[in-house]
């Protein structure tokens, strides 16, 4: 039982080389580096958005895995011919969609080191360097953001706070919501979970809805509080307080507020300080989601957007968005790490060890959902060391400058308007009704619907060209085109060229 047949030596003869042979690793590794270097050199020439149809790859690849080994040369040929056509090129300098996934040499090489070591750092003992480097780089980045010391690790352990690298914002919100949930249920009884209420704005990322669902929050108790143009779609503290008071009146228990610095739709900023002041009156856990815009806050001129963070309970940003660190790398800081650990810890016999029992080390398995974890801190460490604070600020400012340039180009064409104020490096614009309807415009739903339809048509036309790629959002009933600068290879000439593409397609649609 469980033994290999003695008369079948096929598996031994087919692949005599060890899968981790150092010389072969060096040979193939150089080929991959050269392949990717050529890709980055030529990525500008590809259609930015993939032009394939659903199911294209199934028609190109075999129905089953190969029985015999294939060479890396053959595999890379297939990557070129079959995989690259199906990629949307997030590293293209003409990529302006969603939010950036900015890469860098340091981030890529850090990922190589992390993957090469292939350690599983669930606790300190399993790889001390992985744990300790993570706590160090989280303090470094926290200091760059001038986060209060209550969010950082202290040498004497007095602060109670600290940072951890999660995969995504979804995970960060789920972990903090779970900690807040258990902390509250320990006070009011676990049978009252259906009374817990979560608050956010109608602009908050859908990650909160997913986290609440997983954490067992009653879907009816997730409040997406309406925002308006009057506050640039930021969450009003008065609206928050009204919602809280209504829930208390109904016998519900306010639990958690997710405030956002740089919403996905329009980069709106919720007023952290005033919102925290309201939340603290009712014992609500406040999480600050700065997934996109948090990176910019290492620049002094943007730091004010997170003023008031000292009164929050947790704060997160995605280094894989706008901080030149490859996916995935979400940085989460908490003030009360004990609440996080109590909600998420497990201690099976096979993981017990003297280091953990000494209480002198961090076991990051207890700061996240999963047990296993990657050596994410390696790539962030390389990014911080390879570029330094000064250069990272310069990179971020260059993207903001290019967004301002694009905004200026829009301002010179009276057919267009900026829908919401530009705050960081994203511009939200649209064709104006007056450019579409020659007669005098009156405010009515028909005109707005038709304007939205023409803007939909414009964006689809631009993206189908493959020259640039942008995405859209709808705020306050207005369909707008989002132009997000942040790809590492983007230069001002690409921004200028993108505007020319928009104008050309506008001319074609309007018959100019």
Curated annotation (Swiss-Prot):
The positions annotated for binding L-tyrosine are 100, 205, 320, 350
Q: Which InterPro entries match?
A: Aromatic_deC, PyrdxlP-dep_de-COase, PyrdxlP-dep_Trfase, PyrdxlP-dep_Trfase_major, PyrdxlP-dep_Trfase_small, Pyridoxal-P_BS
Q: Which Pfam families match?
A: Pyridoxal_deC
Q: Which GO terms describe its molecular function?
A: pyridoxal phosphate binding; tyrosine decarboxylase activity
Annotated EC: 4.1.1.25
Summary of the function given for this chain in its UniProt record: Tyrosine decarboxylase that converts tyrosine into tyramine, a precursor of isoquinoline alkaloids and various amides.
The entry's protein name is Tyrosine decarboxylase
Q: Which organism is it from?
A: Papaver somniferum (Opium poppy)
Q: What gene codes for this chain?
A: TYDC
